[in-house]
Design a protein with these regions (language model features):
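Short, well-formed alpha-helical segments that are part of the catalytic scaffolds
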Residues: 17-31
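Short beta-strand-to-loop acidic/aromatic patch adjacent to the donor-nucleotide binding site
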Residues: 92-104
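Conserved donor NDP-sugar-binding/catalytic core segment of glycosyltransferases
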Residues: 108-138
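Non-catalytic, C-terminal membrane-associated alpha-helical segments of glycosyltransferases
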Residues: 229-234, 246-308
Length: 308
């Protein structure tokens, strides 16, 4: 591993989340560098007013590697992630690592990602996300956002952009030449579609459970109102993905209709004191309704206000 001379570019995308970004950059400045690699860092700001530039300027002197700032004027998740790819290719990167601007990376984060990446010979690796929930979070929130690790170095189907590293062969024009799909700019799931496109071309992904990032949840994201909106949007986006690939439409639609019918049937009993919390049933109904809306063309712009 020490003689590989891989060049890793860490890409971070941000939009109007200044305080979390400061914590993210502070943690990044303290990471260990994998032996035998060159590491560089790219921050892509989706704010046309370059609102994150002053934060970048304040932290670059603490970084143990070269840093670059870019403003991407085209709004959306796919646009900023593709900008990371384009700039990383210009830097002749052999691998790209990504995490989110509301996350804190562990000191050994990059070392662990790279270790599994090299040992497995895979095209990409996915790390572990620990969610730091607000104090007094409900049991429902804790159940919906569990902290768990995948077993070491197993095959996975998703390369989540909140904690991953992948070979530039996936994105190089001379390789698989995959990009994030602009159709999912504001809906999310752009990393799921990216992963599917890579898998369809024969790519292999592995888990790197010791590569840890910590995501801080705000109080707003722990409210039932937020969860309703998020689950409805997720249902819509799942339908968008299914329509994009035209697979599993009929079977999934039948499943969602039956899910709505069943949960509407049992909901009155839950409200009267059943053993299961009615909130969970309401969320599942909401997600199923989102799927049906997405099936008929409705879209969600959940990520218009920020980049996750």
């Amino acid at each position: 591993m020490g003689d590989s001379n891989d060049r890793i570019v860490i890409g971070l995308c941000t939009f109007n989340r200044h305080e979390p970004l400061k914590e993210a950059l502070d943690s990044l400045a303290q990471i260990d560098i994998p032996e035998g690699t060159e590491v560089e860092f790219i921050l892509v700001d989706n704010d046309k007013n370059e609102g994150a530039k002053y934060i970048f300027d304040a932290y670059i002197h603490d970084m143990p590697f070269k840093c670059y700032y870019f403003m991407e004027k085209n709004r959306g998740l796919a646009h900023v992630r593709n900008r990371v790819i384009e700039e990383a290719l210009k830097l002749r990167a052999t691998a790209i690592a990504m995490f989110d601007d509301d996350e804190i990376v562990a000191r050994e984060w990059l070392v662990e990602l790279y270790k599994v990446f090299k040992e497995s010979g895979s095209d990409g690796v996915a790390g572990t996300v620990y969610r730091l929930l607000p104090m007094n979070s409900s049991d429902l929130v804790k159940k919906l956002w569990p902290n768990s690790k995948e077993p070491a170095n197993i095959s996975v189907k998703l390369l989540p952009t909140n904690n991953c590293l992948f070979s530039t062969n996936l994105v190089d024009p001379k390789g698989r030449n995959i990009r994030f799909d602009n159709a999912f700019n504001f809906s999310g799931r752009e990393d799921l579609v990216f992963s599917f496109d890579a898998l369809f071309q024969g790519a292999k992904f592995r888990s790197a459970p010791q590569a840890i990032v910590i995501e801080k949840f705000s109080k707003e994201r722990s409210t039932f109102k937020y969860l309703l909106k998020r689950w409805f949007g997720t249902g819509i986006t799942d339908a968008m993905v299914a329509r994009h690939y035209s697979f599993g439409m009929g079977k999934r639609t039948l499943k969602e209709i039956l899910s709505i019918a069943w949960r509407c049937l049992i909901l009155p009993f839950l409200l009267l004191g059943g053993t299961r919390p009615p909130a969970a049933a309401i969320l599942y109904i909401t997600a199923s309704l989102g799927w049906l809306c997405g099936l008929f063309g409705k879209k969600t712009n959940y990520y218009f206000k920020h980049i996750d």
